[in-house]
Design a protein with these regions (language model features):
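One-carbon transfer enzymes
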Residues: 1-215
């Protein structure tokens, strides 16, 4: 309901693994997550042992909450992105509540996860300017863009023997999918934001490329 009807934005288009330099020939293990007690998932034992014992670091994407001994098997653990400042905005959807609350910035966190929700060590954290973002989708795009450089920075930090990652000082409120009046707020802000975005594009000064004088 919150995704807004329309085509999938370009920043969410999937990229086939075989098209990515450096990992096209990587081994792939297809598996079904094993439900953990309470909440979250485990990796199947055989996959956990094979990957964990032969990997320097794992990056979790689209696997839900991952728990269990596997988190400590890779040399540098398991990393996960959180689109939000863990001391202010936890839960989901990332960036949505910052949009509804008219925040000027939104956080992005790369964390080494453990069994406690959102309590793992922070490897890299950053914030993006969203003061002029007219829709949640625009906030989401900016947060995802920030993740690219953060992953490279995080790997470099993990390779640095002098770097010490630390857990968050405190954890903020846990947000969930909005309902009731919050959905109406979202619809209203999105409608207004789209209109403002169109006017901003129309009023933007036209830029022209000029030839620099030769020396």
């Amino acid at each position: 309901m919150l995704r807004q009807f329309g085509p999938t934005p370009e920043y969410q288009w999937p990229t086939p693994i075989e098209d990515i330099d450096g990992v096209a020939d990587a081994d792939r293990f297809h598996c079904e997550p094993v439900p953990a007690a309470g909440f979250g998932n485990h990796l199947p034992t055989d996959v956990a042992e094979t990957v964990g014992e032969n990997t320097d670091v794992v990056v979790r994407f689209g696997f839900g909450v991952l728990k269990g001994e596997f988190l400590e098997m890779p040399t540098h653990g398991v990393l996960s992105f959180h689109r939000g400042d863990l001391e202010s905005y936890r839960g989901q959807p990332g960036g949505l509540w910052e949009f509804l609350n008219d925040e000027p910035t939104a956080g992005v966190t790369l964390q080494r996860i453990d069994d406690d929700l959102d309590a793992g060590e922070i490897v890299v954290e950053d914030e993006v300017d969203i003061a002029d973002a007219h829709t949640w989708r625009e906030i989401e795009r900016r947060q995802i863009e920030a993740c690219v450089e953060m992953l490279a920075a995080g790997i470099e930090r993990l390779r640095d023997p002098d770097h010490e990652s630390t857990p968050p000082d405190s954890l903020g409120s846990l947000y969930t999918i909005p309902s009731g009046t919050d959905v109406l707020r979202y619809v209203g802000k999105t409608a207004v934001g789209r209109v403002r975005s169109r006017y901003a594009e129309r009023d933007a000064p036209e830029t022209r490329r000029t030839r620099q004088p030769s020396e």
